[in-house]
Amino acid sequence: MLSPKKMKYRKRMRGRLKGKPTGGTDLTFGDFGLQATECGYINARQIEAARIALTRKIKRTGKTWIRFFPDKPVTKKPAEVRMGKGKGPTDAWVAAIRPGRILYEMEGVPRELAKEALRLAAHKLSVKTRFVERS
């Protein structure tokens, strides 16, 4: 599972998802990509599940890139614990996704296969996406 090796602060405020992404909206490495069309959080388990679905479909041919990283800790208190007594321990790592962000890229595979593989990967994610290609 993806998670940061070292953080300056162990816990972070929840914050709000709004606006457009500051970068990562264009295809940089590959010829085909998966682009987010809405805001949301994607956790490390979803990222890994989508990556596995992608690589199984293309049978390890070509090359893929994951263009985002889960760098935000999400905390959760245990079940049946009273309120107060501080913030709970880190439960998961998530990536904050804004519309237009490129999530996955790939090259070295035919267009139809890339489209199908990225469609399978998109089913594993919690945000709406669309298929994009280099023009």
UniProtKB/Swiss-Prot annotation:
Organism field: Desulforapulum autotrophicum (strain ATCC 43914 / DSM 3382 / VKM B-1955 / HRM2)
GO biological process: translation
Keyword rRNA-binding appears in the UniProt entry: yes
Assembly notes: Part of the 50S ribosomal subunit.
Paired cysteines (S-S): none
Alphabetical keyword list: Ribonucleoprotein, Ribosomal protein, RNA-binding, rRNA-binding, tRNA-binding
InterPro entries: Ribosomal_uL16 (IPR047873), Ribosomal_uL16_bact-type (IPR000114), Ribosomal_uL16_CS (IPR020798), Ribosomal_uL16_dom (IPR016180), Ribosomal_uL16_sf (IPR036920)
GO MF entries: rRNA binding; structural constituent of ribosome; tRNA binding
Pfam families per record: Ribosomal_L16 (PF00252)
Family that this chain belongs to: Belongs to the universal ribosomal protein uL16 family.
Function: Binds 23S rRNA and is also seen to make contacts with the A and possibly P site tRNAs.
Name of this protein: Large ribosomal subunit protein uL16
HAMAP family noted in UniProt: Ribosomal_uL16
